[in-house]
């Protein structure tokens, strides 16, 4: 072999071979193959020749030793090559069937003391129905009270002696946390003192102030409230807020003073002091009602029957009437109704004359309430707690209570509960109170419709709803969305106000943005199944008539928060029910994103679901692309994030540090008239901005004044209450950024200077620009608040073509911004009202913790008849994160606090002062805070660090500023 023709690796490097040499090689190869194969394989041989690699280099990985799977099995067979160990050991080869379950539900209908058919029959008689919301402060015994009603009507459901039943805490998270998160409806049949049965639709609501949106949803579909107050703690933060909310919703108010056993067993008050304590609570509630209500007849008193007393833990519940009936049943020949009228107030019983007097017969005489109610109650509790073995059996015999030997051997708490249950019997006093003082759906319908329906009450539809007509056109108002056990679907919960809803019926669902002019927010759906909800089980029904509550399947897809369900045809004039108006504001903000970016669609679906589940939750996307959740507090957002991660998206989600929403405002009048020209130079608008009068923004938000009023009524309000001149008061164009927004646009032009007809033709466009501007302020894209914008001059083009919305709207927005920036702009931050309960020796520690967080105490007073103090304070929401934990650490867990949004307050410092240097990782002094908040908010939103005036000031306006020698702190 000639070595010159090959390199050291054996590759051929010689001259190209001629065709004769190639033919010789092919000939040799064909002879060898002919010896091995039959003549029939000649064609295959040709293919082999073509595929032969020849002399080129073949990489190891390209060498083919075996035929491919496709060649072996054919092109029709799919083959998958699986590398070894790609599946982690933590993941099973065959995954088990995954069942999600987040709530505790009964598998079958439990036994009740009434037939289900009887319950269904009562639904047809609206006069025998009561729709009631149970509300009250945190841990004042609402859920425990419902447990007593459930035990009374469900003989097989009994709570264990060592723990509460909590039948309406159906979510596992509620039971783990020991606090109600969702409002839970319960429909049961209860008898009154005379044995007459009524259908009670009760909704048990959370007591924590963070979840007051759940209470709002319950109040909307109720005709009255039962306000629960702890006898030992008295009126607390949320009690006062709920009284105000119920009065605003125009609902009947009754009170249940719960946990009266605490006065006896815990505080150990003498009977007379216990009476003073109870009377103080009633007086305090009446004082609050008179403060918020204009109805002078709305007075609470045990004598009127709208106050009852209870101890849910020991199955005690009575009104003066029901306690008097116990005496009547025991001694006979007593008119218990007349007797009940003498059991409250400064009334004494004279045993010699056997008469009641207003003057004490002797110095040692007790008031009738103490003598006939509290002293017997004290004796029963004292006998059970103190003398179980000696005198208790004899005492029980005198009361007609018979216990077995096994029952007498019970521990003190269960024994006391059993004795009280046998003595007081069923909760008929509570039923009497609700029946007498809370209107039936038929009686309360007119008030409910006037308050909640946006359409006319005088229309045929309005009249049908006012009469609660089951044969009228269908109108159903849904206020809550409840997810299924597995968190996949939602059922809409609401109240039928007119007509009858049937399973399988086609309906039209009207959303919150639906109007007769814009019907986009509506959808035709088919009702699935219908249920009556009883906390842990649902009773399926075929139809639900007017006046009842209903859980609806199949209509959840178009509903976001609340909705109006009506008939698809023949109800064209139907309008929506007013969206819920919450008594708190969502000011805490967190940004979320999935750990794995590819799971973003799952997170978005989860966000849509939590938005449905929580009434006041708001979700939005910032311009920077981050997804933001707004809630009322830390606990609220913690529950939202649990549901988002575990129930609805099942993915890992990253959460940013919590921040708060800000507002933008002004503290002076604009330093000069600000104007802006439209892009076509044919129109020019001039405005100034100035602060609103104190209290006016709150009046607008609380709908004390409404933009829908006629000009005369509107003018009178502003003239009398805020000293506006009549011309300005009657020239109000709009509130912004919506009908209840805390900003005002006023037309302050004169007919002699401005063509009012032309100005009127572009009014809608200017209002739209004003509302757009106030929705996103120039400082950091936050809401503008407390600002009055005055239109001083307007040059409007004659031709309609030159004054279209595309020209006017952005110009109006720009002039709003420029007028705002010329009026000494400031940032506003939300402030929380904090109520702390602590022993006297911990009060100083509370002051210390608050002072470190820019907080200040407004009131510090002892709770009457209790060893605790109540400290009331204000704290900036941005400094409130971790406050509760900090407080408990400093007081060894003895202090308990609740906080709720109260007001907006100006942040100290000028946000536009460029001389301030923000040092990273250092707390800023007070005058630097506004600047720090603005810069960090703008960074987070993806905006430039400083406000650029070139966006908001036209060239002619900048020239005018230069002439006026106005120094601006803004970059060009």
Swiss-Prot record:
Compositionally biased intervals (Acidic residues): 17-26, 34-48
Predominant location: nucleus
Transmembrane segments: none
Pfam families recorded: EFG_C, EFG_III, EFG_IV, EFTUD2, GTP_EFTU, GTP_EFTU_D2
Binding residues for GTP: 136-143, 204-208, 258-261
UniProt KW Disulfide bond keyword: no
Gene Ontology CC annotations of this record: cytosol; nucleus; U2-type catalytic step 2 spliceosome; U2-type precatalytic spliceosome; U4/U6 x U5 tri-snRNP complex
InterPro entries in the cross-refs: EFG_II (IPR041095), EFG_III/V (IPR035647), EFG_V-like (IPR000640), EFTu-like_2 (IPR004161), EFTUD2_N (IPR031950), P-loop_NTPase (IPR027417), Ribosomal_Su5_D2-typ_SF (IPR020568), Ribsml_uS5_D2-typ_fold_subgr (IPR014721)
Record keywords: GTP-binding, mRNA processing, mRNA splicing, Nucleotide-binding, Nucleus, Spliceosome
One Gene Ontology molecular-function label: GTP binding
Subcellular location: Nucleus
Annotated GO biological process: mRNA splicing, via spliceosome
Region (Disordered): 1-53
Domain (tr-type G): residue spans on this chain: 127-409
Protein family (similarity comment): Belongs to the TRAFAC class translation factor GTPase superfamily. Classic translation factor GTPase family. EF-G/EF-2 subfamily.
Quaternary data: Component of the U5 snRNP and the U4/U6-U5 tri-snRNP complex, a building block of the spliceosome. Component of the pre-catalytic, catalytic and post-catalytic spliceosome complexes. Component of the minor spliceosome, which splices U12-type introns.
Reported function: Required for pre-mRNA splicing as component of the spliceosome, including pre-catalytic, catalytic and post-catalytic spliceosomal complexes. Component of the U5 snRNP and the U4/U6-U5 tri-snRNP complex, a building block of the spliceosome. As a component of the minor spliceosome, involved in the splicing of U12-type introns in pre-mRNAs.
Protein name in UniProt: 116 kDa U5 small nuclear ribonucleoprotein component
Upper classification of the organism: Eukaryota, Metazoa, Chordata, Craniata, Vertebrata
Gene: EFTUD2
């Amino acid at each position: 072999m000639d070595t010159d023709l090959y390199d050291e690796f054996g590759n051929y490097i010689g001259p190209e071979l001629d065709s004769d040499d190639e033919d010789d090689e092919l000939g040799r190869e064909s002879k060898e193959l002919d010896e091995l194969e039959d003549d029939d394989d000649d064609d295959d041989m040709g293919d082999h020749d073509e595929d032969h690699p020849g002399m080129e280099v073949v990489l190891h990985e390209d060498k083919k030793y075996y035929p491919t799977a496709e060649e072996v099995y054919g092109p029709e067979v799919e083959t998958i090559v699986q590398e070894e160990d790609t599946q982690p050991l933590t993941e099973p080869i065959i995954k088990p069937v995954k069942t999600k379950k987040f709530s505790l539900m009964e598998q079958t209908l439990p036994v009740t003391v009434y037939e289900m058919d009887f319950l269904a029959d009562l639904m047809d008689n609206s006069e025998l129905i009561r729709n009631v919301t149970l509300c009250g402060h945190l841990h004042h015994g609402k859920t425990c009270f419902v447990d007593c009603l459930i035990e009374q009507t469900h003989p097989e459901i009994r709570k264990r002696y060592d723990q509460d039943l909590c039948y309406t805490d159906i979510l596992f998270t509620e039971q783990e946390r020991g606090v109600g998160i969702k409002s839970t409806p319960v429909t049961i049949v209860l008898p009154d003192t005379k044995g007459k049965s009524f259908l009670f639709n009760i909704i048990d609501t959370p007591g924590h102030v963070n979840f007051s949106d759940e209470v709002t949803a319950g109040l909307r579909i109720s005709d009255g409230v039962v306000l629960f107050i702890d006898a030992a703690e008295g009126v607390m933060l949320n009690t006062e807020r709920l009284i105000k909310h119920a009065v605003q919703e125009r609902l009947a108010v009754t009170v249940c003073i719960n946990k009266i056993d605490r006065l006896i067993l815990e505080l150990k008050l003498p009977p007379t002091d216990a009476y003073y304590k109870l009377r103080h609570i009633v007086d305090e509630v009446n004082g609050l009602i008179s403060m918020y209500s204009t109805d002078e007849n709305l007075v609470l008193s045990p004598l009127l029957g709208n106050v009852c007393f209870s101890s849910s833990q020991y199955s005690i519940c009575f009104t003066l009437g029901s306690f008097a009936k116990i005496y009547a049943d025991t001694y006979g020949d007593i008119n218990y109704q007349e007797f009940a009228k003498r059991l409250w107030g400064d009334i004494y019983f004279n045993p010699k004359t056997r008469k009641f007097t207003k003057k004490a017969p002797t110095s040692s005489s007790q008031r009738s309430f103490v003598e006939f109610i509290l002293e017997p109650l004290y004796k029963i509790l004292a006998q059970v707690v103190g003398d179980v073995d000696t005198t208790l059996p004899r005492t029980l015999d005198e009361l007609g209570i018979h216990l077995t030997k096994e029952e007498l051997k019970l521990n003190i708490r269960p024994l006391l509960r059993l004795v009280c249950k046998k003595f007081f019997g069923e909760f008929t006093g509570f039923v009497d109170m609700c029946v007498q003082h809370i209107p039936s759906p038929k009686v309360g319908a007119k008030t409910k419709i006037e308050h909640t329906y946006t359409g006319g009450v005088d229309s045929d539809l309005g009249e049908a709803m006012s009469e609660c007509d089951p044969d009228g056109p269908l109108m159903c108002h849904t206020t809550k969305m409840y997810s299924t056990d597995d968190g996949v679907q939602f059922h809409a919960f609401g109240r039928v106000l007119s007509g009858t809803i049937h399973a399988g019926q086609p309906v039209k669902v009207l959303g919150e943005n639906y109007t007769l002019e814009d019907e986009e927010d509506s959808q035709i759906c088919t009702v699935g199944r219908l249920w009556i909800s009883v906390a842990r089980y649902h009773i399926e029904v075929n139809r639900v008539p007017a006046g009842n509550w209903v859980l609806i399947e199949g209509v959840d897809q178009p509903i976001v928060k609340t909705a109006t369900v009506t008939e698809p045809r023949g109800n064209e004039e139907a309008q929506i029910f007013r969206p819920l108006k919450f008594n708190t504001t969502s000011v805490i903000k967190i940004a979320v994103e999935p750990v794995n970016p590819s799971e973003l669609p799952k997170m978005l679906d989860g966000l849509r679901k939590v938005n449905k589940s929580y009434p006041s939750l708001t979700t939005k996307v910032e311009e920077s692309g981050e997804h933001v959740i707004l809630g009322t507090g830390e606990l609220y957002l913690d529950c939202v994030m649990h549901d988002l991660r575990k129930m609805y998206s099942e993915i890992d989600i990253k959460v940013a540090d919590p921040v708060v929403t800000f507002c933008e405002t002004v503290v002076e009048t604009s330093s000069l008239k600000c104007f802006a020209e439209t892009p076509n130079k044919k129109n020019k608008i001039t405005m100034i901005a100035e602060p609103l009068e104190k209290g006016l923004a709150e009046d607008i938000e609380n709908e004390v004044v409404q933009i829908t009023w006629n000009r005369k009524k509107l003018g009178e309000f502003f003239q009398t209450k805020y000293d506006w001149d009549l011309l300005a008061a009657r020239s109000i164009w709009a509130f912004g950024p919506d009908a209840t927004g805390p900003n005002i646009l006023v037309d302050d032009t004169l007919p002699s200077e401005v063509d009012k007809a032309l100005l009127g033709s572009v009014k809608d466009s200017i209002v739209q620009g004003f509302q757009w501007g106030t929705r996103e302020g120039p400082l950091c894209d936050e809401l503008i608040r407390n600002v009055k914008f005055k239109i001083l001059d307007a040059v409007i083009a004659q031709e309609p073509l030159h004054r279209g919305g595309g020209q006017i709207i952005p110009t109006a927005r720009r002039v709003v911004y420029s007028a705002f920036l010329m009026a000494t702009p400031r940032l506003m931050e939300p402030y929380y009202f904090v109520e702390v309960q602590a022993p006297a020796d911990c009060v100083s520690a509370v002051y210390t913790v608050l002072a470190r967080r820019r907080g200040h105490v407004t009131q510090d007073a002892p709770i009457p008849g209790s060893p605790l103090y109540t400290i009331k304070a204000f704290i900036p929401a941005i400094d409130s994160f971790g406050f509760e934990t900090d407080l408990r650490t400093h007081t060894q867990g003895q202090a308990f606090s609740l906080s709720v949004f109260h007001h907006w307050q100006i942040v100290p410092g000028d946000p536009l002062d460029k001389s301030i240097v923000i040092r990273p990782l250092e707390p800023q002094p007070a005058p630097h805070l506004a600047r720090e908040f603005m810069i960090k908010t703008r960074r987070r939103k993806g905006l430039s660090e400083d406000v650029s005036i070139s966006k908001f000031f036209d060239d002619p306006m900048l020239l005018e500023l230069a002439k006026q020698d106005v120094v601006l702190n803004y970059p060009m």
